[in-house]
């Protein structure tokens, strides 16, 4: 009797092309990422975000349409820890959990990139670009994608 081979495990924190494509195409495939954070008064918060995008090999970004919204207030009040969750069962199983620290980046080049890389649906909800760019420096990525187990750490 043969033992099935274990799937490969990636431990270096570097977003793979498959992870980037999944995150960047989520809304186009009718999915959004769940984003969890802690409010300034210490309460857990959870919301769906359609503009989550891979920003670099070690960062995600979100265009936050409301510059006074809860996640922005949390980050600005010293509660930068953010978790994001993605799951799908078909056409193939993908489960991803991202953990990191968010920061508002006001540099015009960053704002422009995050806004323009957001899905058109999201951009159309903030045509005047009143939102802010939230960049998440990742600490870990866990999950399963493309036959690979992810246990990535910074």
Feature roles, as predicted:
Residues 1-154:
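Binding-site signature for planar aromatic cofactors or substrates
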């Amino acid at each position: 009797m043969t033992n099935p081979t274990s799937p490969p495990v990636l431990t270096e924190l570097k977003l793979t092309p498959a992870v980037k494509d999944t995150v960047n195409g989520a809304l186009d495939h009718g999915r959004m990422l769940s984003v969890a954070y802690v409010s300034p008064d210490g309460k857990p918060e959870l919301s769906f975000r359609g503009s989550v995008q891979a920003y670099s090999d070690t960062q995600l970004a979100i265009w936050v349409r409301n510059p006074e919204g809860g996640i922005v207030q949390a980050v600005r009040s010293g509660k930068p820890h953010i978790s994001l969750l993605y799951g799908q069962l078909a056409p193939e199983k993908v489960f991803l959990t991202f953990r990191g620290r968010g920061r508002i980046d006001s540099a015009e080049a960053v704002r422009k990139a995050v806004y323009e890389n957001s899905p058109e649906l999201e951009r159309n909800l903030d045509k005047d670009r009143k939102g802010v760019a939230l960049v998440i420096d990742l600490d870990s990525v866990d999950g399963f994608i493309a036959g690979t187990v992810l246990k990535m750490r910074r």
